[in-house]
Design a protein with these regions (language model features):
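Envelope-exposed proteins and targeting segments
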Residues: 21-23, 37-39, 63, 139-142
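Short acidic/His-enriched helical or mixed secondary-structure segments at domain edges of catalytic enzymes
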Residues: 10-25, 34-36, 68-114, 118
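Proteolytic maturation boundary segments
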Residues: 115-162
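Active/ligand-binding-proximal structured segments within catalytic/core domains
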Residues: 1-3, 13
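M16/insulysin-pitrilysin zinc metalloprotease superfamily fold
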Residues: 6-7, 30-89, 159-162
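Soluble periplasmic/extracytoplasmic beta-strand elements of cell-envelope proteins
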Residues: 26-28, 40-44, 142-146
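Buried hydrophobic packing residues in well-ordered domains
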Residues: 15, 41, 58, 82, ...
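Glycine-rich, charged/polar anion/phosphate-binding loops
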Residues: 24-29, 128-130
């Protein structure tokens, strides 16, 4: 949430508002998994801008969170977003059951669900910095670039009966 999720996040502020090189930017990961999983970043490069420049800017923000802990405001905003999402995720008996079932399935145990808010509130700026340094390390990255192809023109063909 500090790097992504919202217009006040570091990536959005940097790439969309300040540098104006991206139309959208963010990050996400799967929280409910037993083993290490995918944490990914994405950006929609503004027409006319270089993909490499946007990638470099994303990497600079990753490096920044590894070397500069989030401010208290950033940390509290992230905690509020995470807590609200967790509460809204349980807005029905079905969703509560799914969440408890997922926790059991991955071996975390259903009790972890009830401890989630408390554990989130206990996270410190140094915890965020330490996790970013460990999990977002340069030697653990894979980069992919999706480049749209120009539309192909089709020769006019007579209508085919069905």
């Amino acid at each position: 949430s500090i790097l992504s999720h919202g217009k006040s996040a570091r990536l959005y502020q940097s790439l969309v508002y300040e540098q104006k090189t991206a139309l959208a930017v963010g990050a996400d990961y799967g929280l409910m998994q037993a083993d290490p999983g995918l944490f990914y970043f994405y950006a929609v490069v503004k027409p006319g801008e270089k993909v490499e420049a946007v990638e470099d800017a994303v990497l600079k923000e990753i490096q920044r969170i590894q070397t500069e802990p989030p401010s208290e405001l950033e940390l509290q905003r992230a905690k509020n977003q995470i807590e609200a999402a967790h509460i809204f995720e349980q807005d029905s008996n079905f969703r509560q059951a799914m969440l408890l079932g997922e926790a059991e399935t991955i071996g975390a145990g259903w009790r972890k669900v009830s401890q989630f808010v408390e554990r989130t509130r206990a996270v410190t700026a140094q915890d965020v910095q330490r996790a970013a340094s460990h999990y977002l390390a340069a030697d653990m990255r894979t980069t992919g670039t999706l480049i749209p192809q120009p539309p192909q023109t089709q020769a006019a063909s007579p209508a085919q009966p069905h």
